[in-house]
From Swiss-Prot:
Enzyme class, first EC level, given as a word: hydrolase
Residues binding ATP, per UniProt: I23, R24, G65, K68, T69, T70, E131, D132, Y133, R174, Y184, R221
Keywords: ATP-binding, Cytoplasm, DNA damage, DNA recombination, DNA repair, DNA-binding, Hydrolase, Nucleotide-binding
EC number(s) reported in the record: 3.6.4.-
Record bears the keyword Lyase: no
The protein's role, per its UniProt record: The RuvA-RuvB-RuvC complex processes Holliday junction (HJ) DNA during genetic recombination and DNA repair, while the RuvA-RuvB complex plays an important role in the rescue of blocked DNA replication forks via replication fork reversal (RFR). RuvA specifically binds to HJ cruciform DNA, conferring on it an open structure. The RuvB hexamer acts as an ATP-dependent pump, pulling dsDNA into and through the RuvAB complex. RuvB forms 2 homohexamers on either side of HJ DNA bound by 1 or 2 RuvA tetramers; 4 subunits per hexamer contact DNA at a time.
Subunit structure: Homohexamer. Forms an RuvA(8)-RuvB(12)-Holliday junction (HJ) complex. HJ DNA is sandwiched between 2 RuvA tetramers; dsDNA enters through RuvA and exits via RuvB. An RuvB hexamer assembles on each DNA strand where it exits the tetramer. Each RuvB hexamer is contacted by two RuvA subunits (via domain III) on 2 adjacent RuvB subunits; this complex drives branch migration. In the full resolvosome a probable DNA-RuvA(4)-RuvB(12)-RuvC(2) complex forms which resolves the HJ.
Record localization: Cytoplasm
Full protein name: Holliday junction branch migration complex subunit RuvB
SUPFAM superfamilies, per database record: P-loop containing nucleoside triphosphate hydrolases, Winged helix' DNA-binding domain
Region listing for Head domain (RuvB-H), in residue ranges: 258-334
Species, as recorded: Psychromonas ingrahamii (strain DSM 17664 / CCUG 51855 / 37)
């Protein structure tokens, strides 16, 4: 099982990029769910604008689907500058990055998604560009090779990552502003669902939006994906209004429960409860019981379950929590 295949994955699917761009907020005033980030960025952006300077380099990190790309475009819009976007895996050679940097204009934004996946050779080029707005380029080969320095316009690098801990210290230390995006609360997600429903010209009740938001795992990308599937259901079933009943029927059909769990989440938790009597159970045994790779369990399934308090990792293995027993209606062994 691959994370991208799951309906409740925060990772963007290939066909979602165009739709996500259309419903993405353009300015901080419309940016929901990250009040501290919003407040701080408003100050930093206004200060840079008043001084007519490039904003300090910005690192945005957090789980997938929370709006890192959205925030980077908002920053560019608020500063009224151009934004060029790329990603770590695409920048294979120093020349790839040099081509982008030399095409930037004064105070422009360069956005690098998955910045933790930059190759070491590209990262080395980035250091003087970030610090001194200079590009060191090697001309020629062998004994005749020489280094020349190119001056770059002042620019803002925005790096986005789901794995801030994987960044090298020299790269991380060069970001003047660091923002962590948190999972969204129910109210914020409900407003996002209603806003997207308006974009799709859907007749949706607030209760219907709440039902979708509740099952969206605190993630706007998942909320918008579930909204599109609920829209399909309502259209085929000829429902005039997407209320909580229609949303429940659609999401139950999709096997997304009221905690946002899908089949694989429930399979893992039920294995711990039923097969291993609540745990503790080792990772090898758990992987064998549910027929999944250990890496998939650790990297894809467990993080959200642990964060929501349904699973605990202990030195002796995984154990189910009180919330898990309540959710599945099991009595906890004494």
């Amino acid at each position: 099982m691959i994370d991208e295949d799951r309906l409740i994955s925060g990772t963007q699917k290939i066909d979602e990029n165009f739709i996500d761009r259309a419903i993405r907020p353009k300015f901080l005033a419309d940016y929901e769910g990250q009040p501290q980030v919003n407040k701080q960025m408003e100050i930093f952006i206004e200060a840079a604008r008043q001084r007519n300077e490039a904003l300090d380099h910005l690192l945005i990190f957090g789980p997938p689907g929370l709006g890192k790309t959205t925030l980077s475009h908002i920053v560019a819009n608020e500063l009224e500058v151009n934004i060029k976007t790329t990603s770590g895996p695409i920048l294979e050679k120093a020349g790839d990055l040099a081509a982008l940097l030399t095409n930037l204009e004064e105070n422009d934004v360069l956005f690098i998604d998955e910045i933790h996946r930059l190759s070491p050779v590209v990262e080395e080029i980035l250091y003087p560009a970030m610090e001194d707005y200079q590009l060191d380029i090697m001309i020629g080969e062998g004994p005749a090779a020489r280094s020349i320095k190119l001056d770059l316009p002042a620019f803002t690098l925005i790096g986005a990552t789901t794995r801030a801990g994987s960044l090298t210290s020299p790269l991380r230390d060069r970001f003047g502003i660091v923002q962590r995006l948190e999972y969204y609360d129910l109210k914020s997600l409900t407003r996002i669902v209603l806003r997207s429903a308006g974009h799709f010209k859907l007749n949706m009740s607030e209760a219907g939006a709440v039902e979708i938001a509740r099952r969206s795992r605190g993630t706007p990308r998942i909320a918008n994906r579930l909204l599109r599937r609920v829209r399909d259901y309502a259209q085929v079933k000829k429902a005039n209004v997407i209320d909580d009943d229609v949303a429940k029927l659609a999401l139950d059909m999709l096997e997304v429960d009221n905690e946002g769990f899908d089949y694989m989440d429930r399979k893992l938790l039920m294995a711990i409860l039923d097969t291993f009597m609540g745990g503790p159970v080792g990772l090898d045994n758990l992987a064998a019981a549910i027929g999944e790779e250990k890496e998939t369990i650790e990297d894809v399934l467990e993080p959200y379950l642990i964060q929501q308090g349904f699973l605990q990792r202990t030195p002796r293995g995984r154990i189910a929590t009180n919330r898990t027993y309540l959710h599945f209606g099991f009595d906890k062994p004494q």
